[in-house]
């Protein structure tokens, strides 16, 4: 600084805010030409004046600063001053260039960019949040009609996050560009007085961008956190509690309650159920395992559900067996799958000889206001009873008074002996009896 000041004063060159003594044609005597003193008072006074003039530059008006800058640019010693500054910078610039190296891209910023691209938040609008939601839904096993509303909410919220992100990113880029343009214009203006190369301007722009990158990283990090929270609330939560379709649940429940004494389907049955429900065999196995656990923990809660499926089964059997006549019909042959149909619109009952079975369930209201209490089957015929399915060692669903559809649940107390079921059809005052062949589900020995 002292050397530059002496050179400028020796050559009559001034700087903005520093007046040139003696006019443009006169040179100020160099301090070295003055008589030396023991304490160096003239040199200290000269440096103090220069510093004082520099401090007063900020107090100058714009017109005064422009006038002094114009006077400096028009001074005849300006080229000499500029060449001296270039020589000084050439000596000191080597160490500066060697110390500055290109900094690598921040890996954290790269991870944030990759995540925003994968979620459809960053990048061009090619489906955006809708494409990301569709991809996530496909990965989670598809979208059922029950979850379509939730997926719509997810897409809407992801679209809002994308809009906010791009709006804030646009503000950030605008502020960064404005500041960079201002600095570049300032450096170009200063390059008329002091040597500034284009590479130095580029280096300064890179420094500005690195300073602004902290703001950009904060914006991207907060956006990624918002996307992760949204995923945890919608897609990830749904993936953990994926539900089967209503039709698949109906098929599985019907099989479970029709095999309640032994709800362990074979591999063939699992494959058939999986095909009907459009799911995998492992999903069928998991469903039955969970269903058995829930049923054992709370039998009373699932009792009503069992009654509902019993009514559905009984109604389907009785409706399928209607022939339009009052005479009884013979059930299907041995390939009927373990059940036989009871036809006719009249009230019917089934009495089994040689065994008893206990009944449990709630008493219901029969036709005519007569109470129906838990009862035991006996060889004697009882009217107003209808049987839907009969299998050994399984729970027997009996529909009491078909016109009322009151369901009762019976359980075998001992293995069934060899017996012949008798169908009693109550018609008026008389009984008409017919012997039926044993269904394949009943023991033959």
Swiss-Prot record:
Residues 49-128 are annotated as: PBC-A. SMART domains: HOX. Keywords: Activator, DNA-binding, Homeobox, Nucleus, Transcription, Transcription regulation. It comes from the Eukaryota. Residues 131-236 are annotated as: PBC-B. Residues 237-299 bind DNA. Gene3D superfamilies: Homeodomain-like (1.10.10.60). Residues 319-332 have a biased composition (Polar residues). Residues 31-44 have a biased composition (Basic and acidic residues). The keyword Transcription applies. The keyword DNA-binding applies. One of its GO terms (molecular function) is DNA-binding transcription factor activity, RNA polymerase II-specific. Residues 13-44, 319-338 are annotated as: Disordered. Its main location: nucleus. CDD domains: homeodomain (cd00086). GO terms for biological process: animal organ morphogenesis; brain development; embryonic organ development; eye development; neuron development; positive regulation of transcription by RNA polymerase II. One of its GO terms (cellular component) is nucleus. Residues 42-236 form the PBC domain. It is found in: Nucleus. Belongs to the TALE/PBX homeobox family. Transcriptional activator that binds the sequence 5'-ATCAATCAA-3'. This is Pre-B-cell leukemia transcription factor 2. It comes from Xenopus laevis (African clawed frog). The gene is pbx2.
């Amino acid at each position: 600084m002292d050397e530059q000041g002496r050179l400028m004063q020796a050559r009559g060159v001034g700087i903005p805010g520093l007046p040139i003594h003696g006019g443009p044609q006169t040179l100020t005597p160099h301090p070295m030409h003055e008589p030396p003193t023991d304490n160096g008072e003239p040199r200290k006074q000269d440096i103090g004046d220069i510093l004082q003039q520099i401090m007063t530059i900020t107090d100058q008006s714009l017109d005064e600063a422009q006038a002094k800058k114009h006077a400096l640019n028009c001074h005849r010693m300006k080229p000499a001053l500029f060449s001296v500054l270039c020589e000084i910078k050439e000596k000191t610039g080597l160490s500066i260039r060697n110390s500055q190296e290109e900094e690598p891209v921040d890996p954290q910023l790269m991870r944030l960019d990759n995540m925003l691209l994968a979620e459809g938040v960053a990048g061009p609008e090619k489906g955006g949040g809708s494409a990301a939601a569709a991809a996530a839904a496909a990965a989670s096993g598809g979208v059922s009609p029950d979850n379509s509303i939730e997926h719509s909410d997810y897409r809407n919220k992801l679209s809002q996050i994308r809009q906010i992100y791009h709006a804030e990113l646009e503000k950030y880029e605008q502020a960064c560009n404005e500041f960079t343009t201002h600095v570049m214009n300032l450096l170009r203006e200063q390059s008329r007085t002091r040597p500034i190369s284009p590479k130095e301007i580029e280096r300064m722009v890179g420094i500005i961008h690195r300073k602004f990158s902290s703001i950009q990283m904060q914006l991207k990090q907060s956006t990624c956190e918002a996307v992760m929270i949204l995923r945890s609330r919608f897609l990830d939560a749904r993936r953990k509690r994926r539900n089967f379709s209503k039709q698949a649940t109906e098929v599985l429940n019907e099989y479970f309650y029709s095999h309640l004494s032994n709800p362990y389907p074979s591999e063939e049955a699992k494959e058939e159920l999986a095909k009907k429900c459009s799911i995998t065999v492992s999903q069928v196995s998991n469903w039955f395992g969970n269903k058995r656990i829930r049923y054992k923990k709370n039998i009373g809660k699932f009792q009503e559900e069992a009654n509902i499926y019993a009514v559905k089964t009984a109604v389907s059997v009785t409706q399928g067996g209607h022939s339009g006549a009052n005479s009884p019909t013979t059930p299907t042959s041995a390939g009927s799958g373990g059940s036989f149909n009871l036809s006719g619109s009249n009230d019917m009952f089934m009495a089994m000889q040689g065994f008893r079975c206990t009944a449990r369930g709630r008493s219901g209201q029969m036709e005519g206001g007569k109470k129906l209490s838990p009862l035991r089957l006996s060889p004697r015929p009882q009217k107003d009873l209808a049987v839907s399915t009969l299998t050994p060692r399984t729970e027997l669903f009996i529909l009491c008074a078909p016109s009322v559809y009151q369901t009762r649940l019976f359980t075998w107390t001992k293995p069934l002996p060899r017996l012949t079921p008798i169908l009693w059809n109550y018609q008026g005052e008389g009984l008409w009896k017919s012997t039926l062949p044993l269904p394949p589900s009943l023991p033959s020995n």
